[in-house]
From Swiss-Prot:
Name of the protein: Repetitive organellar protein
TPR repeat start-end pairs: 1089-1122, 1466-1499
UniProt-annotated stretches for the region Leucine-Histidine zipper: 713-1076
A GO cellular component annotation in the UniProt record: host cell plasma membrane
Keywords for the protein's UniProt record, in alphabetical order: Coiled coil, Host cell membrane, Host membrane, Membrane, Repeat, TPR repeat
Any coiled-coil regions, as ranges: 88-644, 1041-1161, 1249-1410, 1472-1520
Basic and acidic residues: bias regions: 10-35, 61-70, 1537-1547
Location(s), subcellular: Host cell membrane
Residues making up the signal peptide according to the UniProt record: none
Residue ranges of the region described as Disordered: 1-70, 1520-1547
Keyword GTP-binding in annotation: no
Domain notes: The leucine-histidine zipper domain contains 32 11-mer repeats divided by two 6-mer repeats into three blocks.
Gene that encodes it: ROPE
């Protein structure tokens, strides 16, 4: 669908245009703010029509008013569409710029990737990339924070929505209440009116007074009945109060029962305490065991310390060895010193001997001299005297000298002797020292050997000790593990006990919680009872009110009666006077009717009140039933709980009884055992077995029997036993009864005390809890009040600040408006407006910042104060609560201590009573000394039975424990639930407080943001207006100046570029060759480096392998030493084992010797007995008969021989024989008193017997001692054997471990040897490789030398080529000068054309003004004829001008492009020159120049193409003249049947192109937001049509448009207007006339609508044009009966309306904005041979046409030569991401375009056009009006900046001239304007098809446009359901972007 729109006429003055635009925009903005809905916009649009009547289109007199309103709506649509589409176009420009940047960055990326030389640069890039990654991570974190904030905001919005819903509910309730009040008021007024009427009627009516009186009496009776009814109700209420009191009593009983249960719980608590004490005792035992374990560990640590001390001793021994070795070395040094001293002494001796020889020689010389003198004297003949004297003197001297010599000889001899002696001594000392040294050395060697042996022995000993310690440690570890296991078991037991305790606690808690819940239920019931009481009171009050109302009504009735009586009295008097009774019957009938009506009203009132009373009764009964049901449920719960509690109590009591019985039996048994042991004279111990005790008792009984048989032979044992059994049974029964009675009494007393204490404790706890709750509630209320006060204060402060800031902002706005007005006045004069605006903006910004800072500071202070107050309140609350809790804990602790003291006193008393009973029992048991066998048997049987009973009860107790555990769990769950509820309430309070504070802050922030945005909008609008005006002035001035300069400079730049291109080609060829060589060199250098690196790596590997081999060897040696140590330790263990065996053998031998000695003693004893027996036999032969009798009596006795039996024989037999002998002797004494032999024998025998008895006793004691010793020795033997087995096992284990270690060591040695061999092989291989690498190095060096020589030759060739290029450059300069002269000639022609153009414009305006003032039809027809002729002339003049203008503009554009290319080439060359200077390596130069060459080749081609286009300009100018002549005859006229002429359609494409190109830059500068909005809409699959041109002629409403999704339309937009294009079939879905759409709409939740996405542009469109959509919807419903009366559709449409008002966004899937799809028209027949340009072809533009500044240029211009790398890398990665996004969008757009091409010719099933045609009276065929312009104007339209694809399409159009002549289809579509209709009976006619075909064959349209005309007849209502008649027809032409 296309919204066909008509622009208003343009004013002559530009100032008026701008002022009107500003007024319109300001008016629209005000309406957007003030009016929330479209109705206000529609109403305001009518007001604007009054101001624009002079500029509007002329209609007929009949339809003026409706059309004016309609067109003003259209104008508003146009303005709003312009605003939205401007923003969209700005966005598309930005996308294009980003795409261009991305392409250029890709190029530079490729260049930088090809370089890959500067490693430092790569490192920097890596660092930057890491930095960018970090920043990206930070950004992600920020995004997450933002998302969290958004979630919080959404939650807050949800909360606000809930609050809004609550407010709405409250409002609705309030409205309902108001309605009820209004109804009541209405009823009151009706009653008053009725009373007034009654008064009027009573005055006229007389006869019915008696009936009225009767009815009054009836009413009084009714009132009495009502009163009685009320009394009955009151009685019912009192009865209900009685039932409530009964329930209260029942609740009190329940409370009493709960208190009893509490007492039971306290009993359970006391039992728990006892169990805890037992548990504490068990813990103490465990702690003792742990202490024992710790002591064992300490012993182990002490042993470890001893071992360490031994190791230290061993180390000290080694140090001593080292000292001895050092002493030896010192002694050797001393020996050498002695030798040196001896040498010195010998040298001194030799010197002294030399001195002696010298002295001798001197003296000999002197003697000889003397002798010579003497001989000379003799020769002279000196006197003898003289000679004699002289001889004497000489002799004296000689003697003296001889004495001196002798002395000297003596001295020296002595010295020599001393020296010799010293030498001899030294030699002796030397020899001694040598001997001593040798001895010492031998001793030291021996000592060292001994020490080594000792060390080895010590090591072995230490190793053995270590092994022993290790064994001990292992044992201890095992013991440790066992202890740990025991600990774990004990811990498990403890945990189980803890769990049991916890279960009991949980049960306790559950019971407490149950009690609490029951208390809560009671409280709830009380509250409900109170509420019911309150309701009952309210009911009573209501009844009282009703009574009062009834009384009031009775009073009113009485008053009425009085009035009636008075009136009747008056009437009677009047009747007496008048006596006219003719009309009385009528009056009576009227009165009867009125009375009947009143009676009805009274009955209705009565029924109403009765219904109310019935409702109250029903409610009362329902509530009563509910309360009774609740009470019954509570009673059932209570009964169930009581049953459970009774069961628990019974089980606890049974458990206590069983425990008491078990303890009694155990104590009785223990006392029995003790008493038996004391009786038998045995030491009591707990470990005695029952069988042993039985044996001891039987032995004791036999002894007693023997003794008793000796004393009383006549009495028998059986009688004694029977008596004892009877006595024992009686005594035991009495004792048990007494014991049971006393225990029962004590238990009852204890229970009563415990219950009392529990009740006291519970009462105190309840009181404390209530107090605590009251205090907490008070604090909570205080806290809430404080919060409310703080919030109110905060709101007041915020409102004050907001008002202050609003006032200040208003003042600023006023000041700003004044200043802006002054600046505008100055701007009209043209004086410094920019500077003033900038200063004002700065001041305003500073002032706003100051205000914001103040506001922030004040809000921060308030928030801090609020927070501090809140913290103080919370702290006080927390302190108070803690104090209460501490008090509660202290009181509970005191109560617990008192309870424990009471329980302890009771327990002590109980123990004392039990002790007394035990003492009595012991005394009574002491009497029972006989009959132990049978008694013990009975006790054993009873014990078994008791044990079985206890086990059964224990099983029952386990079930009881499970029940208790379940109860504890329930209690814990209840406690957890209550704690969670408390926490949740605290959290809710905190959250509510935070939400309130946040809401206040958000409100204030929103207000501040709104004010700031409004102010910014005002400033930006003024700035934009100012910039637009300045830009227009500057552009007009600059274009004139720059055109001349650019044209002159363009030719010179072209020549310079050609020269540079050639130079660059040569350089690049040179650099390519050089770069190849250099790359080879670098490759070989890198290979050499790699080889060296490999050699170094291999050497390092070899070193590592050697080190590893050494390490392996060391490890092997260490392991060998360890093995030796292990062997030594094993030997030591064997020695210790042998010693232990020897010790054991010795002990065994000693014990065997002792046993032999004892056997000897026994044998001696037996010999003695045999002797004695022989003696007895010899003496007792006489009394054989007596002996037989005695023997028979003895044989009758039942004696067990196995009890007192030794190794030597039967002792009992000897004892019996002795007794026999005694009897025999007693008989013999009685009979033979006279015989003396018998006396002597008797006396002797008695003495012997006494001796024997003593010896037997001694021997018995010895035997017992020996038995004990034998047992001890046997135990020791067993222990020693166990030790021996353990040691043997350990020895075997050690041997196995040693064998395993030996095997492992052998394997390791084998593996290491194999590894060493492998490594040696690797080393040999590596050495070979090293030699090969060295050979390759030599080869590479030779190749490098050759390459250098080649490079020098290439440089020489390069210089020669440069000289040739300079010659060509000079030739090109001459050509440039000739072209300049030609350009100056063309300038003159352009000036003349401009003058002609201005004249034509003036004439055109005059014609338009004259046409607009005419109204009548006759004048219109005349004007049509005149305008046809004028228009032809205008078209001629315009075309003359436009052709020249287009050519001039093309020259300018081409010059701009050439200069732009030159600038880029210069900048790039400069940049690369600088980089070449920086990096003096051949490889970089070559790569850079190759890349430059590739780029410049592309640009050179473009430059050559531009030059070729310049040369074509001359030919185009010549062809324009023929085009003008052809255009004059190219107009088509369409004539109707009535003779009305249709407007002519003239193509003004040249002018349109000029307008597009002239104002493109202005469009982009003025409205940058336009493209942004277009791009945002394009993202949502929304496409826009730009109305580029519309004809000013009213009769010829021709509109030219272009789709703005085509990227090249940016260059051709000027005064365009944007139109939204929708798919016709989708209108049904948008209008909610489609099931699918409505189903989707109904699925969406209402709350979600407020969170849906919708672009702001689309939402504004819907809000503004909702009335249009509503009318369109009504039209569709009228056309299609399917959609009429569909409630779902209507309901969803109404909801949609409300959501558009409230919601900020909509769901994307709800509305579809798509490109327009053409219907399947008659043109499909001719489309087979027509090559339509596809949308995909439009989108496939080349990326070379998109040009932006390169990174290098940015680097130069921004002065970031050093910092450019960091900045540009960061920017590069951001732009890369944007580039990928652009590519994705391109793919999406291309896919859409393909779909559109596929579906282009498919028509939808439903369309408004078809329906309009169906409704119209006549259906005309679609006709075509094809207008052809010059073919060659297609060439002129081409812009030099178009891409290669457009050039290809133009070439195809040129080549297919013949096909175009055949296929006469064009892209022009004539659609009907909404008001375009024709009157009935009128039919539009066109030329015949034959004529049209002839015209089409002759001429083709320049635009290749299809002109599609929809002709409708009859008066049909438009889309707005308005009747319209209009003869003016509008055709919409889609402009092809290729022309």
């Amino acid at each position: 669908m296309i919204f066909n729109l008509k622009k208003s006429k343009k004013n002559e003055d530009g100032s008026n245009k701008d002022s009107k635009k500003t007024n319109e925009t300001s008016g629209i903005e005000k309406k957007e703010k003030s009016n929330k809905w479209y109705n206000k916009i529609v109403n305001n649009s009518t007001k604007k029509d009054k101001d624009k009547n002079n500029d509007s289109i002329v209609y007929d007199d009949e339809s003026k008013v409706g059309e004016n309103d309609h067109h003003m709506k259209e104008y508003e649509l146009e303005d709003q569409l312009k605003e939205t589409l401007k923003s969209i176009t700005a966005l598309s420009i930005k996308v294009k710029e980003y795409e261009v940047k991305i392409e250029e960055l890709e190029k530079e990326l490729k260049l930088e990737k090809e370089k890959q030389i500067n490693k430092e640069y790569e490192k920097e890039l890596n660092e930057k990339s890491e930095f960018i990654k970090r920043q990206m991570e930070l950004l992600k974190e920020k995004e997450l924070n933002i998302n969290l904030k958004e979630n919080k905001i959404n939650n807050k919005e949800i909360i606000t929505l809930k609050r809004e819903e609550k407010l709405n509910d409250i409002e609705s309730e309030y409205i309902e209440k108001n309605k009820e009040k209004e109804k009541l008021n209405y009823e009151v007024t009706n009653i008053k009116m009725s009373l007034d009427k009654l008064t009027c009627e009573v005055q006229e009516k007389k006869d019915n007074l008696e009936k009225i009186n009767k009815k009054v009496i009836e009413k009084e009776n009714n009132l009495r009945e009502l009163k009685e009814f009320m009394k009955e109700k009151n009685e019912i209420i009192e009865s209900l109060d009685g039932t409530i009191n009964d329930k209260k009593n029942a609740y009190e009983k329940l409370e009493i029962s709960f208190e009893e249960k509490r007492k039971m719980i306290e009993m359970l608590d006391s039992k728990l305490i006892e169990k805890e004490e037992n548990f504490a005792n068990k813990q103490a035992k465990l702690e003792k065991e742990n202490e024992i374990i710790i002591e064992k560990l300490k012993d182990i640590e002490s042993r470890e310390k001893d071992f360490k001390s031994k190791e230290e001793k061993f180390a000290s021994m080694e140090n001593e060895l080292n000292t001895l070795k050092s002493d030896l070395s010192k002694n050797a040094c001393q020996m050498e010193v002695y030798k040196l001293e001896i040498k010195d002494l010998s040298q001194s001796l030799v010197e002294k001997e030399r001195e002696i020889f010298e002295i001798k020689n001197e003296y000999d010389d002197k003697i000889n001299n003397m002798k010579e003198k003497l001989s000379s004297i003799n020769d002279k003949g000196i006197d003898n005297t003289v000679l004699h004297s002289e001889e004497e003197k000489i002799n004296k001297l000689l003697k003296e000298k001889e004495t001196e010599l002798n002395e000297i000889h003596k001295k020296y001899n002595l010295e020599i002797e001393t020296i010799k002696n010293e030498l001899n001594e030294k030699e002796e000392e030397l020899e001694k020292n040598k001997k001593a040294h040798t001895v010492e050395v031998t001793n030291l060697t021996k000592e060292i050997k001994l020490l080594e042996k000792k060390t080895e022995d010590a090591k072995e000993g230490h190793k053995n000790e270590l092994n022993e310690l290790n064994n001990q440690l292992s044992k201890l570890n095992k013991e440790k593990d066992n202890i740990k296991n025991e600990n774990t078991e004990l811990n498990d037991k403890i945990s189980s006990l803890n769990s049991e305790v916890n279960i009991l606690n949980k049960d306790k808690q559950t019971l407490g919680n149950d009690i609490k819940t029951l208390n809560d239920l009671i409280n709830n019931l009380k509250n409900e009872i109170n509420t019911s009481d309150n309701k009952m009171n309210k009911m009573k009050e209501d009844l009282a009110m009703l009574n009062e109302e009834m009384e009031g009504k009775c009073v009113v009735i009485d008053e009425i009666e009085k009035k009636y009586k008075n009136e009747i009295f008056m009437l009677e008097e009047k009747l007496k006077e008048k006596e006219n009774y003719a009309d009385l019957n009528d009056e009576i009938s009227i009165l009867r009717n009125s009375i009947y009506v009143k009676e009805k009203e009274f009955i209705e009132m009565k029924e109403f009140y009765e219904n109310k009373i019935n409702l109250f009764n029903k409610n009362f009964e329902e509530k009563k039933n509910i309360y009774e049901n609740e009470l019954n449920s509570l009673r059932l719960k209570y009964d169930n709980e009581q049953g459970l509690i009774k069961q628990i109590d019974e089980l606890n009591i049974q458990k206590l009884k069983t425990e008491e019985k078990y303890l009694q039996l155990y104590n009785d048994n223990m006392h029995m055992f003790r008493s038996i042991c004391t009786k038998i004279d045995m030491p009591y111990s707990e470990n005695i077995k029952g069988s042993d005790l039985v044996d001891f008792v039987t032995a004791y009984i036999k002894r007693r029997d023997e003794s008793s048989s000796d004393a009383n032979p006549d009495t028998t044992h059986k009688e004694m036993v029977a008596e004892l059994e009877k006595r024992h049974a009686a005594i035991v029964a009495e004792l048990e009864e007494k014991h049971k009675e006393e225990i029962a009494k004590l238990g009852e007393g204890h229970k009563e005390v415990v219950l009392r204490l529990g009740e006291q404790h519970k009462e105190e706890t309840i009181i404390l809890e209530e107090k605590h709750k009251d205090v907490v509630t008070k604090l909570g209320e205080q806290h809430k009040e404080n919060i409310i006060k703080l919030e109110e204060e905060h709101k007041d402060v915020v409102t004050k600040l907001g008002d202050q800031y609003k006032e200040e902002i208003a003042k600023l706005k006023e000041e700003h408006a004044v200043v802006v007005a002054e600046l505008e006045e100055k701007h009209k004069l043209g004086e410094g407006h920019k500077e003033m605006v900038d200063e004002l903006e700065k001041r305003h910004a500073d002032f706003v910042e100051g205000l914001e800072e103040k506001h922030k500071a004040e809000t921060a202070k308030l928030e801090e104060g609020h927070k501090s107050e809140m913290n103080e309140v919370e702290k006080r609350h927390a302190d108070f609560v803690e104090g209460l809790e501490e008090k509660h804990k202290a009181e509970t602790a005191k109560l617990g201590e008192g309870h424990r003291e009471v329980v302890a006193g009771l327990e002590e008393k109980h123990k004392e009573v039990v002790a007394e009973l035990e003492e009595k029992h012991k005394e009574e048991i002491a009497k029972l000394e006989e009959g132990h066998k049978e008694v013990m048997a009975e006790l054993g049987e009873k014990h078994k039975e008791v044990v079985a009973g206890l086990e059964a009860k224990h099983n029952l107790e386990e079930g009881h424990k499970e029940m208790v555990a379940e109860l504890e769990k329930r209690h814990a769950d209840l406690v957890a639930v209550l704690e969670e509820q408390h926490k949740a309430e605290i959290i809710k309070l905190g959250e509510e407080h935070k939400e309130v504070v946040a809401g206040i802050e958000e409100k204030y922030k929103v207000e501040a943001i709104k004010l700031a945005e409004e102010h910014k909008d005002v400033v930006t609008k003024l700035g934009e207006q100012h910039k637009e005006e300045i830009a227009k002035l500057e552009d007009g001035h600059k274009e004139v100046v720059n055109e001349v300069e650019k044209k002159n400079a363009s030719l010179l730049n072209m020549l310079e570029e050609n020269h540079k291109n050639e130079m660059i080609k040569l350089k690049e060829e040179h650099k390519e060759s050089a770069s190849d060589l250099v790359e080879k060199l670098y490759q070989k250098d890198e290979e050499v480096k790699n080889s060296n690196n490999k050699i170094e790596e291999l050497t390092n590997v070899i070193k590592d392998l050697n080190d590893s081999i050494m390490c392996y060897k060391k490890q092997i040696l260490e392991e060998v030493e360890k093995r030796n140590e292990y062997n030594e330790e094993i030997n030591k263990l064997k020695i210790v084992q042998n010693e232990m065996k020897d010790m054991n053998d010795k002990k065994i031998l000693e014990k065997e010797n002792e046993i032999k000695k004892l056997n000897k003693k026994l044998s001696n004893y037996k010999v003695f007995e045999t002797k004695e027996n022989t003696y007895k036999n010899s003496e007792m032969v006489v009394n054989e008969n007596k002996e037989r009798i005695i023997v028979d009596s003895v044989c009758k006795e039942n004696i067990s021989e196995s009890d007192v039996e030794g190794k030597g024989g039967n002792l009992k037999m000897t004892l019996s024989l002795k007794k026999k002998e005694r009897n025999i002797f007693s008989i013999n004494d009685n009979k033979n008193e006279s015989s003396e032999l018998v006396d002597t024998i008797k006396s002797a025998y008695i003495n012997k017997i006494e001796m024997y008895k003593k010896e037997i006793e001694d021997n018995g004691k010895n035997i017992e001692d020996l038995k004990n010793k034998i047992l001890d020795l046997s135990n020791e033997l067993i222990n020693l054997e166990n030790m021996k087995n353990v040691l043997t096992d350990e020895n075997n284990n050690l041997k196995k471990e040693i064998e395993i270690k030996d095997n492992k060591l052998n394997e390791k040695e084998k593996n290491e040897n194999t590894e060493i061999l492998n490594l040696n092989d690797d080393i040999i291989k590596l050495k070979k490789e090293i030699s090969e690498w060295k050979d390759e190095e030599e080869k590479l060096t030779k190749e490098n030398i050759k390459l250098k020589n080649d490079i020098e030759q290439i440089n020489k060739e390069y210089k020669i080529k440069e000289e040739n290029l300079m010659i060509k450059f000079n030739e090109n300069i001459n050509e440039v000068t000739s072209l300049k002269n030609q350009i100056e000639i063309e300038k003159m022609k352009l000036e003349e054309l401009n003058k002609n153009y201005e004249l034509l414009l003036a004439e055109k305006r005059e014609t338009n003004m004259s046409i607009s003032n005419d109204d009548n039809k006759i004048v219109e027809n005349n004007i049509l004829e005149d305008t046809d002729s004028k228009q032809n002339n205008l078209n001629k003049n315009v075309e003359d001008k436009t052709g020249d203008d287009i050519n001039c503009e093309k020259n300018n554009d081409q010059a701009k492009e050439i200069s732009y290319l030159k600038d880029e080439i210069k900048k790039i060359s400069m940049l690369y020159g600088e980089e070449l200077n920086r990096k003096n390596s051949y490889d970089e130069k070559v790569k850079n120049l190759t890349n430059e060459l590739k780029e410049l080749k592309i640009r050179n081609k473009k430059g050559e193409e531009a030059i070729a286009e310049l040369n074509k300009l001359k030919n185009i100018k010549e062809k324009n003249k023929s085009v003008k002549q052809n255009d004059e005859s190219s107009s088509n006229n369409i004539i109707t049947k009535d003779g009305d002429k249709t407007p002519e359609y003239v193509s003004n494409d040249d002018k349109i192109q000029k307008d597009w190109k002239a104002n493109l830059v202005l469009k982009l500068k003025e409205k940058p937001d336009l493209w942004d909005n277009i791009n945002s809409l394009e993202k949502e699959n929304f496409r826009v049509m730009s109305i580029v041109k519309e004809n000013k002629n009213v009769q010829n409403d021709k509109i030219v448009g272009i789709y703005s999704y085509f990227k090249k339309c940016e260059k051709e937009l000027k005064n365009d207007m944007l139109v939204i294009c929708l798919v016709l079939k989708d209108i049904l879905s948008i209008l909610f006339l489609n099931d699918n759409f409505v189903n989707l709409f109904e699925k969406i939740d209402k709350i979600l609508w407020k969170q849906m996405y919708i672009p702001t542009e689309i939402r504004i469109l819907f809000l503004r044009y909702f009335s249009f959509l509503d009318k369109l919807r009504n039209y569709v419903k009228c056309v299609n009966e399917e959609y009429v009366n569909n409630e779902r559709y209507e309901y969803s449409w109404a909801l949609f309306q409300t959501y558009l008002e409230t919601a900020s966004n909509l769901k994307k899937e709800m509305i579809y904005y798509v490109l327009e799809k053409a219907e399947k028209d008659s043109c499909e027949n001719n489309s087979s041979n027509f090559d339509k340009p596809k949308i995909t072809d439009i989108l496939n533009f080349s990326k070379d046409s998109i040009r932006l500044k390169t990174i290098a240029q940015l680097r130069k211009e921004l002065n970031f030569e050093r910092e450019a790398k960091n900045i540009l890398n960061y920017d590069y990665q951001i732009i890369l991401n944007k580039y990928h996004e652009c590519l994705r969008k391109l793919k999406i757009v291309k896919n859409m375009a393909r779909e559109l091409d596929f579906n282009y010719n498919v028509s939808s099933k439903f369309s408004i056009k078809k329906e309009l045609e169906m409704c119209s009276d006549e259906n005309d065929e679609f006709k075509y009006n094809n207008i052809k312009n010059n073919e060659e104007k297609n060439d002129t339209i081409k812009d030099p900046k178009h891409n290669n694809l457009i050039q290809k399409i133009i070439n195809l159009q040129r080549n297919k001239k013949t096909e175009k002549k055949k296929n006469n289809l064009v892209n022009e579509i004539n659609t009907m304007y909404p008001g375009d209709t024709t009157p009935k009976g009128k039919i539009f006619t066109t030329n015949d098809n034959s004529k049209q075909n002839e015209i089409l064959k002759k001429k083709d349209n320049i635009n290749n446009n299809i002109t599609h005309k929809n002709v409708y007849t009859g008066q049909v209502k438009n889309i707005f359901n308005e009747p319209v008649e209009r003869k003016v027809r509008i055709s919409f032409i889609h402009k092809s972007p290729f022309n």
